[in-house]
Amino acid sequence: MTFSSIARLTNLGWALAALLVLAASAHAQIRVTVDRNIGSAATKEFKFKNVPAPAKEDAAAKATVTLLVGENDPAGGDVSVLTDGLLPAKADEPKSNFYFASGSGGGRVRMDFGSVVEIKQVNSYSWHTGAGAPQVYLLYASDGAEIGFNAEPNANTDPIDCGWKLITTVDTRKSGDGGQHGVSITDAHGILGKYRYLLFGFVATETDDDAGNTFYSEIDVVTKKP
């Protein structure tokens, strides 16, 4: 199935089709660790049992973050809140989170580190009282060196066809709605790869109403130290 045909499906259909079709191409050694805090365990420190707490001095903090596809909700923060090291103090704090426009099916966000770096971990964090807590996205990466590389794939372009590699898919909906969701993407061999760019293909968690877009509080990228 091509990306263009997926794009013609409904938002929920797109999410399911993309996850099912592309999951098979994810690297066999990739590990996706999912954790969730609810009740009193959900604090502004975002401390999880199995996922590292957010960091302030990570590679993402210095990256250029660009919204490629979709629109951010005007009630929330822009893409800069994903890497500013500042966390919401409570659930449902719109301006402290990035999320796509109400009723939309998601979109794409790119990180550019300026040069190739060795990436060890990609960690993402979200917090909401309902369907805006789970995380659903596809993570791609590229060093930008492949012939025909497209740094800005639009909604009808499959990143795999223009120099991007699918790293993995993330779907934390089985953990339940509400609370804090933490995700840590690692590799069994220690390094996810040497890349200049990361591309996040975010998908709405549900389409039963207009409130299915995740409140992303922070995304960290941990690189190998020189």
Where are these regions (language model features)?
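Bacterial N-terminal signal peptides that target proteins for export
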Residues: T2-A15
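Cleavable N-terminal signal peptides
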Residues: A15-L16, A26
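Sec/Tat signal peptide C-region and signal peptidase I cleavage site
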Residues: L22-A28
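Trp- and acidic/polar-enriched beta-sheet ligand-binding modules for extracellular glycan
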Residues: Q29-A53, D58, G103-G107, T129-P226
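Predominantly extracellular/luminal regions of secreted and cell-surface proteins
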Residues: D35-P88
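Surface-exposed, low-complexity/disordered Ser/Thr/Gly/Pro/Asn-rich loops and linkers
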Residues: V79-S104
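Short beta-strands within extracellular/lumenal beta-sheet-rich domains
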Residues: F98-V116
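A short beta-strand element within beta-rich, extracytoplasmic domains
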Residues: E118-T129, F200
